[in-house]
Structures are given as C-alpha cells and as structure tokens.
Amino acid sequence: MTITTLSRQNIQALTPYQSARKLGGNGTIWLNANEYPTSPEFQLSGKDLNRYPEPQPQRVVQAYANYAGVSTENVLVTRGGDEGIELIIHTFCEPKQDAILFCPPTYGMYAVSAETAGVLSKTVPLTDDFQLNLPEIKNHLNDVKVVFVCSPNNPTGNLLKQSDILDLLQITAGKAIVVVDEAYIEFCPEASVINLLKNYPHLAIIRTLSKAFALAGLRCGFVLANPELIDILSKVIAPYPIPVPSADLAEQALRPANIATVQALTQELLSNRQWLAKALLVLHQVEKVYESEANYLLIKCQNGQAVFKALWEQGIILRDQNKTLHLQNCIRITVGTRNECEKVVEAIKEVK
C-alpha cells in the first residue's frame, strides 16, 4: 500500500487544472493568465495579525455590496472566484449521485472542482458562435444540480446572450442552481445579470478582484445571490476564509476613489485591446481574431503551435488553446500594456 493508493480513486485519476503559473516558462512578458499588466499600490493599514480574521470581513462585504448595487445579505466573500465555484458544488451536489453541467470551451475549474468533490460532470458544447445550446441543455438536466456558464466566456471572450441566460434560469427553476461566472464583467459592466437576482432565487453570480481590480495575488472573490442561498453557503465555507491583509487591501480597493481609478484604467486597457485586435488581423499567421468583451483576445492561427512556441522562446508567454474543444490552432492573449502588445505583434510577424 502506497500513499497514492491510499488516496481516493477519482483523485488518483484526476488531471489537475493547468494554471498559467503551473505551466511556467521563463518569460519577461506574461500574457497567459488574464492578469492586469500593472500592480496597484496599497499599504496595509492594520497590524492585528495575532488575531483570527472575521468569518466574513464586514467592511469588505459592505463595500462590495455598495459597488455591486445589492444588499449585504446578497454577498459572500471567498478566496477568489474559485472557492465560490467549489463551495457551490460541495453545498448542492451529492457525490457520485448529482452532476454539474457546463458548456465547453469554457473555464476549466468547473470540471476539476467537480471531480475533486466526486461529483459527475455533464457537458453541452457551445454552438459554433459560442452561444448556449438551450435545447441540448434542457435534454441533459437529469440529475444536474448546478449549471455553470461564463460571460464573458473564458477563453473565447464573447458574451452569452442575456435572453439565453434568462431562458436557462426558467428551465432550471426548482431543479438546479445556475451560476453565472462574471469574473471579467468589469470590462463590460452593462452585460451583468445582477438585475436578475431579485427574480431568480436559484441564480448565483461569481465575481473577483483578480482581473480589472489588478489584485490576482490577493485571492479575493465573491458570490452574489439571494439571502437564502448565501446562508446555505455560509454553513459550508471555511470559518476564516479571508486573511486579515487580504481583507484590508480589498476594502481599500473598493473605496470610491479607487473604483474610479479602476474604471479609468479599464478604458485604457480596452483601447489597447482594440489596437491589438486590429494589428493582429493583418498578420499572415493569424486567420481570425475573435470578438472579445474581456481583457484578452482569442486568435486562430495557421499554425498555432509554431506561433506559441516561437513567442515562448522569446520570453513572451501566451496561453495555448490547441487542445481545447473546437479551438485547434487557437491562442489566448491577455491584453497587456501598449508596449507589450506591440512586442507580441512584432514577434508573431516574424514567425514563418
């Protein structure tokens, strides 16, 4: 008997999520994790590190509720959006009995989180234009307790039709929780489904400070939902989920002055995205630049592997999507600074 064989069988067979950092590389330009290209400057204001943190940091809860336009009863603070995903699966799905459903190509952590919890996964691929296939979803809802959708979708960058999300909420009412992952919503805030919370008690929204707020290293996310759903999740979440320093910096990030700064910097990044998309379109190696509402672009190349490898060797680290469903020869490029975008274009231009 070895340590490995003592572990659960599903864990022995598990292929872990391949995060950008785990994939590594020796880059000087990191455009593979959808991080903001520059870091904000905050200073820790508290020194009470000898005390355990609050179960839920109330100043952060209040600040995010104000920002999102909801009540504090609608907010649960989590260790990044990923903990929110895991928490919902653990709370609502019986292992080896219930299933989640998601629509690839999409964020890989839905599948990994279900697998580690011993929960089944069902998939209904997106349509050719990366939208929900509602008839097929309806046909696959047996035993499904949670449906995950991502809008803007990672890695494709497009928005799901809000009318389709509304239809999804209607066909799942009384049957399953619908989770809308809005990790990238700050880049298109008008597309949020937060206005649907009051009418759909089975809707949960995932948010994060990792993207537009440029705080990926903080690991601070949120679940937004009706009070009953939040109360149930609160039974399961760890007793001290948010470290004191993380709560301190998150509260500073959510002050009105910094939110205004984030919104201004977001406009600058969107300008860089527009420039990058136009510049990539004219390159001989690039066959298509997909429309994006997020801080990244998905491109289809004549030879995606050659482009990815050539830039990797120059220290420009992108995200290879070649093995992702329907994304052969595709690469995801995080929108960086204008200088970084220019270097990406020049490097791809040189690929033969």
Swiss-Prot record:
Which keywords fit this entry according to its UniProt record?
A: Amino-acid biosynthesis, Aminotransferase, Histidine biosynthesis, Pyridoxal phosphate, Transferase
Q: Which Gene3D superfamilies match?
A: Aspartate Aminotransferase, domain 1, Type I PLP-dependent aspartate aminotransferase-like (Major domain)
Q: Name one GO molecular function term.
A: pyridoxal phosphate binding
- Please list the cofactors this protein needs: pyridoxal 5'-phosphate
Which residues are reported to carry the modification N6-(pyridoxal phosphate)lysine? Answer: K211
Q: Under which main EC class is this enzyme filed? A: transferase
Record EC number = 2.6.1.9
Q: Which GO terms describe its biological process?
A: L-histidine biosynthetic process
| Protein origin, superkingdom | Bacteria
Q: In which pathway does it act?
A: Amino-acid biosynthesis; L-histidine biosynthesis; L-histidine from 5-phospho-alpha-D-ribose 1-diphosphate: step 7/9
Recorded catalytic activity of this chain's protein: L-histidinol phosphate + 2-oxoglutarate = 3-(imidazol-4-yl)-2-oxopropyl phosphate + L-glutamate
InterPro entries per record: Aminotrans_II_pyridoxalP_BS, Aminotransferase_I/II_large, HisP_aminotrans, PyrdxlP-dep_Trfase, PyrdxlP-dep_Trfase_major, PyrdxlP-dep_Trfase_small
Q: Which family does the record claim for this protein?
A: Belongs to the class-II pyridoxal-phosphate-dependent aminotransferase family. Histidinol-phosphate aminotransferase subfamily.
UniProt cross-references to NCBIfam families, sorted A to Z: hisC
Q: Which PANTHER family match?
A: HISTIDINOL-PHOSPHATE AMINOTRANSFERASE, HISTIDINOL-PHOSPHATE AMINOTRANSFERASE-RELATED
Q: Subunit info?
A: Homodimer.
How is this protein named in the record? Histidinol-phosphate aminotransferase
**Species this protein is from:** Haemophilus influenzae (strain PittGG)
